[in-house]
Amino acid sequence: MAIQPPGSNTKANKKGAKKNLKIDTFSKKEWYNLKAPAIFPNNVCGKTMVTKSSNKQNLALLLIGRKFDINQADLTGNLEEHARKFSFRVNEVRGKDCIGVFDGMHMTSDKVKGIIRKWHTLIEAEKDIVAKDGTILRVFVNAVTKKTPTCTSKRVYCKTSEEKKIRKVMFDVIEEELKGEDLNKIMKKLAAEVIGKSVEKKGSLIYPLQNCCVIKVKTVKRGKDTSNAMEIEAN
């Protein structure tokens, strides 16, 4: 006869057994609103949750530093601007609102892939600029050569010397438009594609260009006065 190990007799342990009570995990969570800068018409982006472990716990410390991406079409209500996404970082908590500050921008992958053309020259440039509050941003710009009506060849390649001149134009435009500006103005220029239009206008004097746009903006170093640089609606 096999010997049962201690505790295996369920009938004998029924009297002292404890019931496993199901705990609703969502009852310990609190919801907060995610808000973008007030320069956008629809600055309430969504909600985020945080787990509350005790009544004395400061939940703001758990929320500060969280990042979220929002499509520009959702921020402005214009569906034609769906190819651009802005990144924000929670820098302050006011009541139930998480105030986000600019943390970067990038184009969607399908838009970036659609810029490239076969038998054309792709010109890329990246440059670091310093904003008004000391934030260091790395800006990436792309441009593609354009076929003119008088061109008979299917290959539209520019010379290396022309490519260097166009890249120099990109550097100058990035520095002229963004250097020393506050983050609100930088976001407005990125949303309106001011840099891409200026690069296409000035660079086309060297060689015809198309699809000139800022594909990415990366935050290399955050400034000290980021919270004061952003004017956010409290309500």
From Swiss-Prot:
* Record bears the keyword Ribonucleoprotein: yes
Q: Which SMART domains match?
A: Ribosomal_S3Ae
Question: Cytoplasm: present as a keyword of the record?
Answer: yes
Gene Ontology CC entries for this record: cytosolic small ribosomal subunit
Q: Which residues carry this modification: N-acetylalanine?
A: 2
Q: Which family does it belong to?
A: Belongs to the eukaryotic ribosomal protein eS1 family.
The protein here is known as: Small ribosomal subunit protein eS1
Q: Please report the organism this UniProt entry assigns to the protein.
A: Vairimorpha ceranae (strain BRL01)
